[in-house]
Amino acid sequence: MFSRFSWPRITRCFRSYPKKKSSCISFTHHAREHTNFKKPAVVGASITLMASVALVDFDPVKHAGVSSKRAYRVVLAGFLCFSDYKKVLGSSYASEEERQLALSECHLRCAERSLKVFEENGGIYIKIGQHLSAMGYVIPKEWTNTMVKLQDRCPSTSLKDIDHLFRVDTGKGLDETFDEFDPIALGVASLAQVHKARLKDSDVWVAVKVQHPSVSLNSPLDLSMTRWVFKAIKTFFPDFKLMWLADEIERSLPQELDFTREAKNSIETKEHFAHLSTSLYVPEVMWSKPRILVMEYVAGARIDNLSFMDEHSISRDLVSVDICHIFNEMIFGKGGHLHCDPHGGNVLIRSKPKNSKSPRNYEIVLLDHGLYRDIPHELQVDYANMWLNIINFNEKNLKFYAKKVANVSDENFPIFATAITGRPYKSLKSLPIGGPNHEEEQKKFISALQKGGMLQSIIRLLSTMPRLTLLLMKTNDLVRSLDENLKTKSGPEKLYLIMARYCLRCVYDDKMDSLWNSRSFWVSKVFKGTYYRLSYLFSSLKYTLAENYFYYKHMYL
């Protein structure tokens, strides 16, 4: 995902440290006197100029030219896409297959046209493209497959600009903050990049996340242009169902651009899991500013690095089980504080270090805590009840909770059941939990969906669902995807059975809280509480036994 690049040689701020050979730049220990500077206060109607508060050398004329060019690219590409879609959708075709082929070709042309604009504009446009690439459950595959290319095409910020950003945001340059700073980034993403460094007068190595300076400068205009494009699409195509995406981007981007929020999320997650027996490890936060985050440096391999696990005798099946526990705890645990982007690049695996509390011979390291969602307690309980009724297939109750959680009508219920389980609705009673177990079965199922037009129906349904519900479903899907990437032997059933136990606990805790807060006599509370407790223990034991059965069946039989 991340790209590497060559850095320019900088001699103004630092020099090589003579006593130690290193790939890092070592700074002189002589303190420097710096003149005081002030951040320019830009107040006015222009939201674009508001972003320039972080730049001392802001040039309004130059910025106006750059902004105009960026906006022109978006407007031109938008106009060409509108024209293309209008022509294709307004034409007559001999058959539905011919129409679908023409529409597919149009999707591909417009996606490639947009890709070029995203690459040229950079910044949040690359972030938008990356979001689109992960939305195969809502938008056509021609778009998602095209946007995947943006995962490893993120431009980097020069060391000179990073030093300047440090001076603006902290009053100190890199040489006053670190003894060593690796000029080669550990990773470069659309909004920021990460470097390894050693703290001043210390042996402590840290990871330094630095926001690209151009992002805060251009993001107000970019967000406005994004909303304009979506509104224009809605005007030309009233049936367009993705206006929510513009709302989601406007909501999430400010959170991702504020690294103090990321630090807060990281600390809260670390504290939440501190009392649990888990292999999860969250790096310690040293300090943060809105555009700078300094945290503990943790070396590890990507979670999908199978050779690393095999070399270190790490069980892929146990890793998959632990990941499932971690994210179900986030969804159904107290507080409902959910990490929204658990893809392979944000989850590392490392051998268990000394003094670790992990019950395994490894730790799972969770990174990038910039985007979280707080799940309301009522939604937690309803979502838990929905999944329990899916697993036990109580159709009446399932329809009730599907309507509460996802606003799904009885008419669309079969489509919803297919979307959330990955299996035909009619087979829910007979097939084992987890859906098709073999790649060939999955291909046949997807092919049948496409031929029957069910895939388009699923996409339309998902685009109308509440955003938070869709996010929960996406997280469940990402956990299943990580399990597939690990190529586990224990089968997909375990993921659902583990989730079932968290759902049980969530529903049980809610019942007990409601009971003790009710005005019933204490004797009635004791009897009801005992009944709830026994029911919970029995059901939990049932799912645990089923989980162990499927585990040993796939592993040893």
From Swiss-Prot:
Chain ranges passing through the membrane: 40-56
The organism that produces this protein has a lineage beginning with: Eukaryota, Fungi, Dikarya, Ascomycota, Taphrinomycotina
Bilayer topology annotation = Single-pass membrane protein
Q: Which residues lie on this side of the membrane: Mitochondrial matrix?
A: 34-39
Q: Where does this one sit in the cell?
A: Mitochondrion inner membrane
Q: Where is the transit peptide?
A: 1-33
The protein's name is ABC1 family protein MCP2 homolog
- Answer yes or no on keyword Membrane: yes
| A single GO molecular function term of this UniProt record | kinase activity
Q: Which family does it belong to?
A: Belongs to the protein kinase superfamily. ADCK protein kinase family.
Q: Does the keyword Zinc apply?
A: no
What InterPro entries does UniProt report for this protein, alphabetically?
A: ABC1_dom, ADCK1_dom, Kinase-like_dom_sf, Mito_struct-func_regulator
- For this UniProt record, give its keywords in alphabetical order, as a comma-separated list: Membrane, Mitochondrion, Mitochondrion inner membrane, Transit peptide, Transmembrane, Transmembrane helix
Topology feature Mitochondrial intermembrane, residues = 57-557
Which residue windows are coiled coil?
A: none
Biological role stated in the UniProt entry: Involved in mitochondrial lipid homeostasis.
Entries under PANTHER family matching the protein:
AARF DOMAIN-CONTAINING PROTEIN KINASE 1, ABC1 FAMILY PROTEIN
The Gene Ontology CC terms held by the record are: mitochondrial inner membrane
A biological process (GO) annotation for this entry? phospholipid homeostasis
